[in-house]
Amino acid sequence: MDLKNGVFHGRPAYWLAILVLLAGLLLSLLWAVTFGSVDLKMGDVYRVILYKVTEALHFPVGDSEVYGSGSMSDIVWFVRLPRLVLAIGVGMALALAGVVMQAIVKNPLADPYVLGVSSGASLGATLAILVGVGSFLGSGYVGLVAFAGAFLVSMGVIALANIGGRATSVKLILAGTALSAICAAVSIFFLYVINTSSGALEAVVRWTMGSLAAASWDTNLWMLAVSVLGALFFWTQYRTLNLMLLGDEAAVTLGTDLHRWRIVYLLAASLLVGFAVYTAGIIGFVGLVIPHMVRILFGTDHKKLIPISALLGAIFLLWSDVLCRVVLPGKEIPIGVLTALVGAPVFIYLMARKKYGFGGGD
C-alpha cells in the first residue's frame, strides 16, 4: 500500500510524538487553568485538583479550607477546568471527524462542513431557538435538536449518494454540498421571516460561532468519553481507512468492500460532530487544519494519523479557548471565530511550505 511518509516517520518518532503530546496535554491543562480574569498559580491549581479527586475517592489530600472550598477552589473546579476538559473532548471529536471524513471521500478538503453535517446542526439550532422546536425536551433542547439535525443530514447524504447506484466518494461530496446549501438557505429564510427579539438572534449567532461557556461536568465527561471511544474505534479501523485512500477498485481486489464501511464511518463521525455541536455549538476549521498538519509531519497512515490528530486537536482547542478568554479583557471571543482566524493562516502556511500526497499514489 502506497502511504506517503511525513517529515517524521518510523515507529520511534510515532511513539515519541504520542508521549510528548500526552505530556503536553496534561501540562497544558494545568497551565491553562491559571489564565483568566483572576490570576492563579499552577501549584495551587494542582493542589485543588488533587484535593477534589482524592476527596471523591474518600481520602482527601490537602487543606480542605484552602483547596476544598472558597473562591479559588470554585474558580478552578467549577468554572475553568470544566470548559477546558470540554475543549479537550470537542477538539478530539472534531479532529477525528475531519480525518475520517477526508478518508471516506478521499479528499483532503473534506470536513464536517463539506459533508453538510455542521450545516444540519446549525439549522437544528436555528429552528430550536427561533421556533422552539424540541422545547419539550428540557433545558438542553437546543443542543439536542442541533444533534438531531447533524444526524439527519448525515443520513440524507448517505441516502442521496446511493441514488442511482452505490455511494462513491464523489457522490458523497456532491450530496453533502447540496444538503449543506439547502440547510443554509432554510436557516437564512427563518432568520429573515420570523419577527423575533434581538436576544434570540444573538443566541443563534452565538450558537453558530461556538462557545464553551456553558460547560458542566455532566456534559463534559460524556463528551470526553464519546471522543475517547471514537478514537479507539477508528484506530482499530486504520487498515480499512488506509484502503479508502487507494479507491474502490483497488480495495475490491484486496477483498474489502468499502461501500458498507463508508456508511458506518460517516455515521460514526457524524455522531462525534453531533455531540460536539450539542455541547459547544458550531466550531470550524479544527477538522480541516489538524489532519493536514499531522499528515505533513507523520504521513498518511491512519494508524499514526488518528491518535496524533486526536491529541493535537485537543491541545489546539484548549489553547484556543484560553485565547478567547484573555485577548479582550472583559469580553469573550466566540471560539469558532478564533479557530478560523488561527486555523486559516496555519493551513495556508503548511500548504505553501510543503506539498504532499494524500495517499494512494496521489
Can you say where each PLM-predicted feature lies in the sequence?
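Alpha-helical transmembrane segments in inner-membrane proteins
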Residues: 1-362
